[in-house]
Amino acid sequence: MIPAVVLLLLLLVEQAAALGEPQLCYILDAILFLYGIVLTLLYCRLKIQVRKAAITSYEKSDGVYTGLSTRNQETYETLKHEKPPQ
């Protein structure tokens, strides 16, 4: 019943109101375009700020190697070559 009523109303409507005034569509398109540009700029600015904050916080801490110290002895010891007695 309801789909039949909706179909009947759609058939009786002569023309959509938005299609009658194309200038209004152009104005709304321009507003939407500017809105998209503003949102894109704000998003990029936010990403750059977050990245800079992450870099500075990483530089403040010692990073992955906190608590590790260098060994006092060398990894490879040198071999002493001695000639056999004759």
Curated annotation (Swiss-Prot):
Report the superkingdom from the record: Eukaryota
Q: Which residues form the ITAM domain?
A: 54-82
This protein's membrane topology, according to the annotation, is: Single-pass type I membrane protein
One Pfam family matching this protein: ITAM
The UniProt entry's GO biological process terms, in alphabetical order, are: antigen processing and presentation of exogenous peptide antigen via MHC class I; antigen processing and presentation of exogenous peptide antigen via MHC class II; cellular response to low-density lipoprotein particle stimulus; defense response to bacterium; Fc receptor mediated stimulatory signaling pathway; Fc-epsilon receptor signaling pathway; Fc-gamma receptor signaling pathway; immunoglobulin mediated immune response
UniProt keyword annotations, A-Z: Cell membrane, Disulfide bond, IgE-binding protein, Immunity, Innate immunity, Membrane, Phosphoprotein, Receptor, Signal, Transmembrane, Transmembrane helix
Q: Which residues are on the Cytoplasmic side of the membrane?
A: 45-86
Instruction: Please give one Gene Ontology molecular function term for this protein.
Output: IgG binding
Q: Where is the signal peptide?
A: 1-18
Which stretches are transmembrane? 24-44
Signal among keywords: yes
Q: Where in the cell is it found?
A: Cell membrane
Any one GO CC term of the record: ficolin-1-rich granule membrane
Extracellular topology ranges: 19-23
Sequence positions bearing Phosphothreonine: 78
Q: Could you tell me which residues carry Phosphoserine?
A: 69
Q: Which InterPro entries match?
A: CD3_zeta/IgE_Fc_rcpt_gamma, FCER1G, Phos_immunorcpt_sig_ITAM
Positions carrying Phosphotyrosine are 65, 76
> What's this chain's function?
Adapter protein containing an immunoreceptor tyrosine-based activation motif (ITAM) that transduces activation signals from various immunoreceptors. As a component of the high-affinity immunoglobulin E (IgE) receptor, mediates allergic inflammatory signaling in mast cells. As a constitutive component of interleukin-3 receptor complex, selectively mediates interleukin 4/IL4 production by basophils, priming T-cells toward effector T-helper 2 subset. Associates with pattern recognition receptors CLEC4D and CLEC4E to form a functional signaling complex in myeloid cells.
Assembly and interaction partners: IgE Fc receptor is a tetramer of an alpha chain, a beta chain, and two disulfide-linked gamma chains. Associates with FCGR1A; forms a functional signaling complex. The signaling subunit of immunoglobulin gamma (IgG) Fc receptor complex. As a homodimer or a heterodimer of CD247 and FCER1G, associates with the ligand binding subunit FCGR3A to form a functional receptor complex. Associated with CLEC6A. Interacts with CLEC4E. Interacts (via ITAM domain) with SYK (via SH2 domains); activates SYK, enabling integrin-mediated activation of neutrophils and macrophages.
Q: What does the sequence similarity comment in the record state about its family?
A: Belongs to the CD3Z/FCER1G family.
Q: What is the protein named?
A: High affinity immunoglobulin epsilon receptor subunit gamma
Q: What is the lineage of its organism?
A: Eukaryota, Metazoa, Chordata, Craniata, Vertebrata
